[in-house]
């Protein structure tokens, strides 16, 4: 088979799109004019391209619920034993809790050593909090009980209509169990769901062709609205956060991957296209449907992939966990709020719960941060205004770390519950281009 020209690869197209987006945003930025003493915001071409990125994310979110439903149902209903489903869920939740706790601790450790907020001497009363009002309102409405109750949908249709991943996942698990109990009588339904999943994955392939356009629009908006110059003032926190994410990926996740018998670098190469799409869109959710199919081809059983990946988007957001601890302590440092060990332990315990409410979409981490500061009470919520402008620049590292963490979690859980084909995984890690080819072939309709 002739090798596909590089310009036709999604990998290359997304890189070009990101670079083009940065250039457009930089050379056609938004400006602010003062008219009669009133600041007037004039959006530049870069900011005006925001709908391109938003449209791509909406197209992906449109298909996530049915893809998850079909994947989970066919995975569970097709299993021989229901005990293995419970075992997989238990191992996954234990893994999520341990690894996300490590992520929170690493963020806490690094921010206390680097102290990027010390010396800013910001008076919380002087901050303009108008920009954070909607996040604070959203954050204050969340609680642990409400979050858990929210997992149970009021109606099945509502869960799908609103794109509530955990609600769809709960219904899919129940549907899969019920279908499994029917035995042979449920086979026609299972076959239909399996066939319709191919239709949904074909839609995903169609949408992914638009990924370069989405990445271009999202990147042009970010640079055009906030500008590269806006990074300078709070650059120390951004650098600190990016370095911490890299340390977490290559030390913590790297150690777990070695325990599982493979290299973290090879795994990153396997998901390089997805990482680039995430880099452009700042949302790890944008590649969720692709990851379901890719990890299945890479040797993980469908039932494991269907359970671990969607659940991980709420319970295993390592990048978001690092961000939450670092941002909270940074605000305390910048506003000269004294935090003793007891305060920091309280913050950690609150984050262990509140961080589970973040979804893999842009802005969710900021809402959880508002909820956390409101719950802790000691750190001024007004301090969120300090990081509002740079939050968008940190969302890329958050999303990339989240995706890497969830990919490893799926492979690790599959290995530990005996649901991993090691030969397929090795083949995928050594030849990622072949996996991408198989993904396209798997979703082509078979003609007799």
Swiss-Prot record:
Membrane topology classification: Multi-pass membrane protein
UniProt KW Magnesium keyword: no
Gene3D superfamilies linked to this entry: Sodium:dicarboxylate symporter
Keyword Transmembrane: yes
Alphabetical GO biological process terms: L-aspartate transmembrane transport
PROSITE patterns: NA_DICARBOXYL_SYMP_1, NA_DICARBOXYL_SYMP_2
Highest taxon in the source lineage: Bacteria
Main location as per UniProt: membrane
GO MF assignments: fumarate transmembrane transporter activity; malate:proton symporter activity; succinate transmembrane transporter activity
Family: Belongs to the dicarboxylate/amino acid:cation symporter (DAACS) (TC 2.A.23) family.
Protein name: C4-dicarboxylate transport protein
Source organism of this protein record: Acinetobacter baylyi (strain ATCC 33305 / BD413 / ADP1)
């Amino acid at each position: 088979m002739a090798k596909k020209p590089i310009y036709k690869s999604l990998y290359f197209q997304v890189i070009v799109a990101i670079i083009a987006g940065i250039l457009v945003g930089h050379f056609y930025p938004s400006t602010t004019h003062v008219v009669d003493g009133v600041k007037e915001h004039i959006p530049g071409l870069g900011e005006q391209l925001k709908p391109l990125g938003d449209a791509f994310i909406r197209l992906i979110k449109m298909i996530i619920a049915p893809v998850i439903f079909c994947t989970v149902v066919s995975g569970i209903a097709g299993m021989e034993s229901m005990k293995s489903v419970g075992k997989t869920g238990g191992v996954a939740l234990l893994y999520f809790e341990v690894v996300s706790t490590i992520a929170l601790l690493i963020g806490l450790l690094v921010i206390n050593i680097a102290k990027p907020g010390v010396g800013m001497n910001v008076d919380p009363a002087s901050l303009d909090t108008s920009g954070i009002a909607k996040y604070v309102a959203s954050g204050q409405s969340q609680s642990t009980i409400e979050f858990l109750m929210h997992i149970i949908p009021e109606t099945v249709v509502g869960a799908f209509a609103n794109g509530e991943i955990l609600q769809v996942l709960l219904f899919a698990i129940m549907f899969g169990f019920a279908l499994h109990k029917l035995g042979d009588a449920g086979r026609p339904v299972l076959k239909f769901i399996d066939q319709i999943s191919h239709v949904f994955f074909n839609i995903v392939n169609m949408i992914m062709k638009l990924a370069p356009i989405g990445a271009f629009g999202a990147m042009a908006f970010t640079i055009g609205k906030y500008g590269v110059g806006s990074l300078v003032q709070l650059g120390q926190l951004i650098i600190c956060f990016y370095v911490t994410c890299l340390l977490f990926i290559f030390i913590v996740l790297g150690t777990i991957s070695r325990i599982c018998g493979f290299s973290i670098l090879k795994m990153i190469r396997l998901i390089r296209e997805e990482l680039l799409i995430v880099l452009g869109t700042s949302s790890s959710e944008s590649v969720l449907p692709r990851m379901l199919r890719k990890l299945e081809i890479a040797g993980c059983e469908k039932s494991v992939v269907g359970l671990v990946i969607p659940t991980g988007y709420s319970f295993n957001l390592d990048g978001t966990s690092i961000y939450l601890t670092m941002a909270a302590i940074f605000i305390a440092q910048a506003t000269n709020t004294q935090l003793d060990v007891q305060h920091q332990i309280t913050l950690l315990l609150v984050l262990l719960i509140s961080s589970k409410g973040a979804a893999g979409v842009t802005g969710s981490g900021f809402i959880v941060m508002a909820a956390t500061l409101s719950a802790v009470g000691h750190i001024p919520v007004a301090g969120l205004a300090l990081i509002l402008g740079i939050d968008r620049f940190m969302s890329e590292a958050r999303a990339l770390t989240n995706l890497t963490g969830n990919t490893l979690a799926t492979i690790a859980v599959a290995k530990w519950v005996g649901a991993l084909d090691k030969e397929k995984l090795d083949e995928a890690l050594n030849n990622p281009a072949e996996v991408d080819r198989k993904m396209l072939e798997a979703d082509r309709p078979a003609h007799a």
